[in-house]
Amino acid sequence: MNSIIKGNVLQMTKKVYIRTFGCQMNQADTEIITALLQDEGYVMTGSEERADLVILNTCAVRENAVEKILHTLDHMKGKRRSRPGLLVGVIGCVPQYYREKMFGMADGIDFLAGPDTYRQLPAMIANAGQGIRGADFGFSSDETYCGIEPARSGTISAFIPVMRGCNNRCAFCVVPFTRGKERSRPFRSVLEDVGRLAASGYKEITLLGQNVNSYSDDEAACDFTELLDRVAVAAEGVRIRFTTSHPKDISESLVRVIAARNNICNAIHLPVQSGSTRMLKLMNRGHTREEYFEKIAMIRSAIPGVTVSTDLIAGFCGETLEDHQATLSMMEDVRFDFAYMFYYSVRPGTYAAKHLPDDVPEEEKKRRLEEIIALQGSISGERNAAEVGAVVEVLAESESKRSSEMLMGRTDTNRVVVFDRHGFEAGDLVKVRIRSSTPATLIGTPA
């Protein structure tokens, strides 16, 4: 390792590899952490093999997500045997959820940090280098990492977290336990970030929040509808997306702004979880099946051609076959463009874990999930097939995995498109004629 001078103190430079699991917020957090560490003289590497320090930025939303982390830590044990000086840190939602128990769940962890404590990472890493294990799980009522310029991982699309945490208490969800209560960034700081990204040539900006519609800057009397409108005006010509919305919070005024601003993408992710009002009540979702239908009708009447995606859970506590059929019938009626689909797994500490019996056998959960996946695959296939022959505008994001002669990108409605390169590069906006489709992808050629 090389030596540098930092703050008049001689330090050894360390190469850091961060592996990010889970959601877009975790990806945005990794960019913030990278900036914090680079400011302290650490050097980032894209290879675990070249790293002196490996940080796992983790997700706890489902049981299998935690199992992935534990499997990775087991893999790291072998690395440490051959490289005794290697440090390993686990940060994010898993250590925040399990706290000090995490040290006993896997060997060889040098430090643990929750999502509100990333400013403490340089000190924790320095202690770990001296053989001192550390953990910090403090929640903050105001930490939004405002003022830190993230080390962006790309040059085309960028994330801006505008709020953190969640005040909803859905019965199945760990987010309030791992991300804390809602707090929002000042709207002026968001607009400053947007301005910098637009001036730097970014083509797409996604506003992030665990419950983004709850954004509120009380001092500026600015809610999410106002923020989204101001962002769209400040970054005219840049695609604007946002996620994730709660059905009970999405408003007619917000939908009108999306319809009015050409650069706000016509794609809304609106998790419903179940099509049964009884299950929605058990889940503490705050709305009924009928109210969700009303939201969908309002959105589609205001925004022609909008795509709507969702999240669905199979086999939640007490779910009957009738409840499951209600989910399938909702899917048939709404015809989601795509969906994230899972079967229920108990998360300790949640209301469901404490008060509701996990009484649907795992095999039955899997069977119901298979039905949901099959139906959504059919619906997605039909909706994509309807695009064949159309000319759509695609923001090229990267070279296609299929061939170096093809690019991959997305429409403003968030449909994935693979198309013949024809001299175009990532970052270009390309008019593409759709020739064929699959349930997941549109295939075309420049028009």
From Swiss-Prot:
PANTHER family in alphabetical order: CDK5 REGULATORY SUBUNIT-ASSOCIATED PROTEIN 1, MITOCHONDRIAL TRNA METHYLTHIOTRANSFERASE CDK5RAP1
Predominant location category: cytoplasm
Higher taxonomy: Bacteria, Pseudomonadati, Chlorobiota, Chlorobiia, Chlorobiales
Gene: miaB
Residues given in the record as [4Fe-4S] cluster 2 binding sites: C166, C170, C173
Obligatory cofactor(s): [4Fe-4S] cluster
Its biological purpose: Catalyzes the methylthiolation of N6-(dimethylallyl)adenosine (i(6)A), leading to the formation of 2-methylthio-N6-(dimethylallyl)adenosine (ms(2)i(6)A) at position 37 in tRNAs that read codons beginning with uridine.
Free-text remark on how the cofactor is bound: Binds 2 [4Fe-4S] clusters. One cluster is coordinated with 3 cysteines and an exchangeable S-adenosyl-L-methionine.
Protein name: tRNA-2-methylthio-N(6)-dimethylallyladenosine synthase
